[in-house]
Amino acid sequence: MLLGQCQYCGFCERFGCEANAKGSPHITVIPVALRYSNVDLRTYCWVTKVLMDSTGKKATGVAYVNVLTGEEIEQPADLVILAAYGLSNVHLMLLSGIGKPYDPETQTGVIGKNYAYQGGSNVALFFEGVSFNPFIASGGWGTSIDDFHTNWNFDRSKHGYIGGSYISVGGSNGRPITYRPVPPGTPPWGSAWKRATAKWYQSALAIGASGMVMPNRYNTLDLDPTYKNRFGQPLMRMTFDFKDNEQKMNRHSAEVIGQIGRAMNPTIMGNPNPRLTWNVVPYQSTHNTGGAIMGTDPGTSALNKYLQSWDVANLFVMGASAFPHNSGYNPTGPVGALAYWAADAIRERYLRNPRQLV
């Protein structure tokens, strides 16, 4: 597919690209797939569950609702692949009764286990008279260091945690409406806020740390006992907070980025802000992993190494829901690699002889 050229409009992050300059699925993967006569793309469809046979060991298709008409449809299938967002994959498995739901008290079950997020810290820097042109960030520019992440020579023991954080400085957006960095102490509204917004839009920079999150028995996904979606199904409930390991790691990364920030000699510097507790209100990360993890033991994992369900041989589950824990790095690259890995196993091994591949 031929991509367009970036227009440096400032709306790259979190938006579709009107110039078709980003490698988004709707201008790359989907148009290529639609060239094949055996591909049928159905929009405005919400899958509600995986259909099973009487044994509960074989998927027979999926049920979905046309959200425009409300029509409920059952689509038969010999092979089912869950390729929704990771959280949605877990939700569908729970709704469909596939695999045993995880119980944090007894530590039995596998579906909903090992939910993980990302830790980290950040600090804002303001440089009077310097222009960083955030609106031409093209989705992400800058640099990062791995000294406190995957560097085996970094002694973590004296800081009291395992894992680590990579540290980066740069920009990922310049959205003219929502990107409005102002120094600490600026009024949240009024003429002073407007002046600060205009003055510092071009001249603000952030240093951030993105840290690992280790699995914890009490960080889980399950079906909510109270709240339901528009189709009357239980919503998925996320139970999560940063534990002692992440708090120590985030405090340490805040110290490091503070040192880096002061060495850059900004006009104004905010306070380094470690993530010590999870909160849905301020943006922290969007990288969710776990809940339907892969492994070598059906008693402790939901999927085998080919992302095939241990319980239902003709069901494969893509996405970061397969990750047993979360790295400081974003999961996008490995998600794509695992999808290729699983697709190859499906085509070269499963379709030739449908069975458990492990």
How does the language model describe each region?
Residues 1-47, 279-284:
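Conserved redox-cofactor binding core of oxidoreductases
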Residues 8, 48-53, 202-213, 218, ...:
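A glycine-rich dinucleotide-binding beta-alpha-beta segment and adjacent secondary-structure elements
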Residues 23, 36, 45, 49-53, ...:
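Glycine-rich loop(s) and the adjacent beta-strand/alpha-helix scaffold that form part
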Residues 30, 93-94, 254-261, 343, ...:
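Non-transmembrane alpha-helical segments in soluble domains
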Residues 38, 43, 55-60, 77, ...:
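Active-site-adjacent "gating/activation" loops or surface patches in catalytic cores
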Residues 57-63, 203-206:
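Short, hydrophobic/aromatic-rich segments at coil-to-beta transitions
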Residues 73, 84-85, 107, 249, ...:
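Secondary-structure capping and boundary motifs in well-ordered enzyme cores
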Residues 108-236, 242-247, 285-290, 310, ...:
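FAD cofactor-binding and catalytic pocket of flavoenzymes
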